[in-house]
């Protein structure tokens, strides 16, 4: 059995749950950071194992990849929490060897825990693993009003200093608790990060355009995002460039300022589809020159401000008539 997943914190939680369920039946875990998505799909296809469980990966923009997986494997199960376009799943209903479980209200780790683990591991281990998945959920779904939010941010910061496969084993071997030295490491990382944030502001890597803040430092995007929103900014965008020259735009909307209809409209107007998460989505675009890049910034601000000014506090489903 193959496990195909993301490479982030939510993938770690999903891995822990999948491993707890299937153990040694999992022969290999494939990770993608989306930049190599098609390559990893092809690697999974040529792998001799015929059963694939996929977690925390969005196929909203890559339906052909999902078709290829299903057509080349005996059985594929997808557990995911990203948004998908309306009627996306209709074309997949023809496959008898495919099952999908989608819930965009919680992170993939919590879905995996609820779907895979009842009755599988001891109650104590299940509680400990669920507690970890809850912290992951607070980070991955960006629940900024949750009391665990700051701790979740620090957990994610620490996570990116580790090898995901080695960390998964270490947490499992420690009874679904973080390794004993994690607290000291997290404190040091947090203190170092605060200095990096200060440097980012001093080096003019943070720029405001009305209610929108642009951040040109992906490494400290999250702490700057939190700071900016605490100071009243409503949309924060991180812009950085991949090695192949393409630009990535990570967009985060402050919670509770737009209704769901407006959040969907924002995604449609900026990237042309409803994908990612309502308050957090990204897209990649080829930019040829500084003028095009400047126009992209202006477009993001314009679309957001227009929707912000026109936003009505009720979605159509909520209107009581």
What is each model feature region?
Residues 166-172:
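Metal-ion/cofactor- or nucleotide/acyl-coenzyme-handling active-site neighborhoods
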Residues 155-159, 173-175:
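Amphipathic alpha-helical interface segments
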């Amino acid at each position: 059995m193959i496990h195909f997943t993301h490479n982030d914190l939510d993938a770690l939680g999903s891995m822990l749950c999948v491993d707890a369920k299937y153990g040694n039946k999992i022969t290999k875990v494939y990770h993608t950071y989306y930049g190599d998505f098609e390559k990893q799909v092809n690697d999974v296809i040529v792998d001799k194992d015929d059963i694939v469980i996929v977690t925390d990966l969005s196929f909203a923009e890559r339906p052909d990849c999902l078709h290829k997986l299903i057509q080349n494997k005996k059985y594929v199960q997808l557990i995911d929490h990203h948004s998908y376009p309306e009627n996306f799943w209709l074309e997949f209903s023809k496959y008898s060897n495919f099952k999908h479980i989608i819930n965009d209200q919680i992170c993939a780790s919590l879905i995996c825990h609820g779907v895979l683990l009842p009755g599988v591991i001891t109650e104590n281990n299940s509680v400990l693993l669920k507690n970890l998945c809850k912290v992951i959920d607070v980070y991955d779904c960006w629940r900024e009003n949750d009391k665990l939010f700051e701790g979740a941010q620090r957990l994610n910061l620490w996570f990116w200093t580790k090898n995901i496969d080695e960390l998964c084993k270490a947490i499992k071997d420690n009874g679904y608790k973080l390794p004993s030295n994690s607290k000291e490491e997290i404190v040091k990382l947090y203190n170092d990060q605060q200095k990096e944030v200060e440097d980012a502001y001093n080096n003019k890597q943070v720029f405001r355009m009305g209610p929108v803040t642009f951040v040109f430092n992906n490494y400290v995007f999250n702490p700057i995002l939190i700071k900016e929103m605490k100071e009243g900014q409503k949309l924060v965008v991180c812009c950085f460039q991949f090695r192949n020259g393409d630009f990535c735009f990570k967009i985060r909307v402050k919670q509770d300022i737009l209704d769901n209809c407006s959040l969907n409209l924002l995604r449609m107007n900026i990237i042309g589809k409803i994908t990612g998460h309502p308050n957090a989505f990204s897209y990649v675009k080829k930019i040829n020159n500084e003028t095009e890049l400047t126009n992209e910034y202006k477009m993001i601000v314009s679309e957001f401000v227009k929707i912000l000014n026109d936003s009505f506090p009720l979605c159509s489903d909520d209107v009581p008539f």
